[in-house]
């Protein structure tokens, strides 16, 4: 593992749960519950960034733009899931808010190895989808370094689209590449 990767928060041992494999079921569930209690405070600290992102999205949609989510693996699945719920929940066109995952629809149910490792595949998505300066592109990457996501946000910025990053690693490469970054850890 290279030094940068080894330094990422997501690659560290969580000292509070390092003995989870030695616990009984109730102990495991209590550890998970304790970790879940951290989430609201972490999100609370990101409210200024979340507000900037929401305002950016609202302005884009009011101006005729669209919102896109991009990610790989679980990050991509979550973006696709969120986007897919907007049509039935809010009555908006499925074209207005879209989720895309490295490896395409097959990757929603099965791992598509190496698709996340191509910055070129990410860049190509912007042209394929006709993303313009009117749109907002959100890159989701727990590590903050997924090449597919970096390719997406870099190319989106090159065409003038606003960019948002969502990651669990503060001071990540993704954070440095986007207009607004939400990094709640």
Task: Locate predicted features.
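Cofactor-/ligand-binding subdomain signature composed of acidic, glycine-rich
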Residues: 1-42, 46
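Short secondary-structure boundary/capping elements
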Residues: 20-24, 49, 114-121
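A short, well-structured juxtamembrane/interface segment
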Residues: 45-62
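Structured helix-beta-strand junction loops
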Residues: 35, 63-64, 177
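Flexible, glycine/charged-enriched surface loops at secondary-structure junctions
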Residues: 42, 50, 174-175
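Glycine-rich phosphate-binding loops that contact phosphosugars or nucleotide phosphates
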Residues: 68, 72-185
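Short, positively charged patches
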Residues: 11-14, 24, 51-55, 66
């Amino acid at each position: 593992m290279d030094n940068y990767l080894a330094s990422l928060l997501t690659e560290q041992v969580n000292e509070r749960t390092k003995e989870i494999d030695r616990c009984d079921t109730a102990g495991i569930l209590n550890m998970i519950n304790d970790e879940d209690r951290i989430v609201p405070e972490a999100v609370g600290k990101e409210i200024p960034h979340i507000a900037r992102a929401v305002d950016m999205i609202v302005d884009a949609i009011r101006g005729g733009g669209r919102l896109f989510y991009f990610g790989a693996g679980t990050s991509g699945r979550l973006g696709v899931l969120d986007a897919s719920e907007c049509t039935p929940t809010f009555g908006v066109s499925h074209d207005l808010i879209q989720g895309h995952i490295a490896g395409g629809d097959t990757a929603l149910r099965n791992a598509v190895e190496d698709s996340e490792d191509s910055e070129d595949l990410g860049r190509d998505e912007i042209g394929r989808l006709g993303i313009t300066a009117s749109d907002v592109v959100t890159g989701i990457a727990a590590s903050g370094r997924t090449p597919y996501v970096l390719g997406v946000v870099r190319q989106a910025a090159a065409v003038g689209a606003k960019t948002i990053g969502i990651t669990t690693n503060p001071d990540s490469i993704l954070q440095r590449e986007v207009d607004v970054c939400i990094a709640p850890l």
